[in-house]
A protein has these predicted regions:
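Right-handed parallel beta-helix
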Residues: 38-40, 81-92, 109-120, 133-147, ...
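Surface-exposed intrinsically disordered loops and tails
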Residues: 67-72, 167-174, 208
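Hydrophobic alpha-helical hairpins/lids featuring a short glycine-rich hinge
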Residues: 74, 78, 105-111
Length: 256
């Protein structure tokens, strides 16, 4: 595939023209790759095929494809670096209410995601930011997710800030080391969140062998709108050196 050629070449640029693209499996993005989505691009997650093969865990994974075949191959921030996913105009990632994620950003660094509209989440997250450093998510829209309950199919954060920890089940990628790497310098700006449980947050925490808490740090949540969320706009758990600035919170906490 194109991104695998780019990995072997040391990087590159992939431009998707206007149209609907149906994903059954993950597209992997290696280092030094920019994916540009032109106006009118729709990425759909699908389930039903003649082969009835289950969909992948995520539509996009920020990881070199050759590493996904190896068990616990990547840890710390040593995965994909210097990668961008940029929308030019109206671009939609539609999960079609299939359980899974839109984007997995695990053990990576220097990542930018911009201008994308997400919809159709079911029981997971739109973006999993996990053990990552220097991630910018800007001018995105996160729309309605399928409702659940705390007992069943509870829809958590649109953007989950987490760490790989086998005790908490923080990440399900077999290629990721469960090394409790925290997130550092994560910026979520100028985005809109509406119609789900939470906007941005963490719902589990990890500790060292000596039972000391491990903290995500340098989190910036700025200039966003959180509207009609069942639970909370921002759910902080074990964050430090965090700034939450100039956001709008409208009719949140109504219950899932």
């Amino acid at each position: 595939e194109y991104t695998e050629r780019m990995r072997k070449a040391g990087g590159g640029k992939l431009t998707l023209k206007k149209g609907t693209y149906r994903f059954q499996y993950s597209v992997c993005i290696p280092s030094n790759v920019t994916v540009v989505f032109e106006d009118g691009v729709v990425i759909e997650n699908i389930f039903d095929t003649k082969a009835h093969i289950k969909p992948a865990t995520a539509m996009w994974q920020l990881v070199p494809k050759n590493m996904t075949y190896k068990n616990k191959a990547i840890g710390k921030y040593n995965g994909t670096s210097n990668a961008k996913m940029i929308a030019k105009g109206k671009v939609v990632f539609d999960m079609n209410y299939i359980k899974g994620l839109s984007i997995i950003a695990v053990h990576c660094k220097n990542i930018e995601i911009s201008g994308i509209t997400f919809k159709g989440m079911n029981g997971n997250h739109y973006i999993e930011v996990n053990g990552a450093k220097n991630v910018k998510i800007n001018k995105c829209k996160f729309n309605k997710a399928k409702k659940g309950s705390p007992q069943k199919a509870y829809v958590k954060e649109a953007i989950n800030i987490d760490m790989a920890d086998e005790i908490t089940g923080g990440v399900g990628c077999t290629w990721a080391k469960q090394d409790k790497t925290p997130c550092v310098n994560i910026k979520v700006t100028n985005s809109v969140f509406q119609g789900m449980s939470r906007g941005v947050g963490t719902h589990n925490y990890s500790q060292t062998k000596k039972k000391k808490n491990i903290y995500h740090s340098k989190i910036l949540i700025k200039g966003n709108t959180f509207k009609n969320l069942y639970d909370a706009g921002v759910y902080l758990m074990n964050w430090k050196n965090t700034k939450i600035l100039n956001n709008r919170f409208i009719k949140n906490g109504k219950g899932n």
